[in-house]
Amino acid sequence: NKLELLKWIREEKKCEWDVGTINAAVGQGNLEMVKYCVANECPINWSACGCAASGGRLEILKYLREEAKAPWGSWTATRAASNGHLHILEYLVERKFDEYEEDACENAAKNGHLDCLKYLHETAKAPWDYWCVQEAHKNKHTKCVQYLLDNDCPLPDGWRYEHGELHVLVESESESSSESEPESSSDYSLF
């Protein structure tokens, strides 16, 4: 039993612990171990809620927020979106979470989680930026790209969306995207 081992290490061997201890318990999905850490004043910060969100561990996230009063931050939504945990995003909205950053939408788009992307944009009112389109396109998540385009997500410099077609700047190996300017229509590829 991992909880018994943790108790032995702390109580018998008097080993130190830090936020990594509770994060490891959260990552394993071991609620009893998390409760032990909280009851015995293990250091905790915003990363514990992020770890719970990353693994889709709603019961642990609820315990951390509602019982342990653990802090959370934008990383909580970002990790949930990155791994497609819509139920975590729904919980965040229910709890009036308001610390969304562009990374949440970007990670949902990057990993093809259209349901999370839609929920973040339409319900959570999370911000987004051109990275969403760029990452969804790069990873060939066409449904996410189309949703972003249909909802006026900003485009990367040099990209265009006209008459239902996405024109993507093809970057040469010797130029960075911030320096390259299209010289002709051959500098674009169509999505």
What residue spans do the PLM features occupy?
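Short intrinsically disordered, low-complexity coil segments enriched in acidic
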Residues: 1-9
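Conserved ankyrin/ankyrin-like repeat signature
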Residues: 4-5, 32-33, 59-60, 87-88, ...
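Ankyrin-repeat boundary/"N-cap" motif
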Residues: 16-24, 43-51, 71-79, 99-107, ...
